[in-house]
UniProtKB/Swiss-Prot annotation:
InterPro entries: KH_dom-like_a/b (IPR015946), RbfA (IPR000238), RbfA_dom_sf (IPR023799), Ribosome-bd_factorA_CS (IPR020053). It is found in: Cytoplasm. Keywords: Cytoplasm, Ribosome biogenesis. It comes from Finegoldia magna (strain ATCC 29328 / DSM 20472 / WAL 2508) (Peptostreptococcus magnus). This is Ribosome-binding factor A. Belongs to the RbfA family. GO terms for biological process: maturation of SSU-rRNA.
Amino acid sequence: MNIKRVRRISSEIKKVISSSIINSLKDPRIDKLNVSVTEVKVTNDLSFATVYIAVIGDDEKKKQTLEGLNKAKGFLKKQIGENVDLRHVPQLIFKIDETSEQSMHIENLIKSIHEENHNEN
C-alpha cells in the first residue's frame, strides 16, 4: 500500500474519532475534556487501526475510558465509514498513550536536578 495513502487515512481516522469523542459519544465513562487522540497507526493492508489516546487522570480513569471507547467501537466504525473513503473500515484497537506522562516525568526529573545543582552553588 502507498505509504502516503496510509498516512492520509490515519490522519482522517484520527479527525473522525476525535470529533466523535467530543461531539457524539454520550458514554459517562469518557470524560471529553480529559481525553485526546494523540495518534492513529493504520496497518499497510488497512485492516487494523491502532488508536492511541491520552487520558488525564489515574489508572481507574484510564481503564474506564478504554472500556467506554471499546463499547463505542461499532459507532466509531460507522462514523469512519461515513466520513472516510474506504472499502472496508479497519478494526479499531485502543491503547493508552503514555508518552505525555513519561515526558512530564522526565521534565520533572530534569527540573529537580537543576534545582539541586542551583542550591549547591
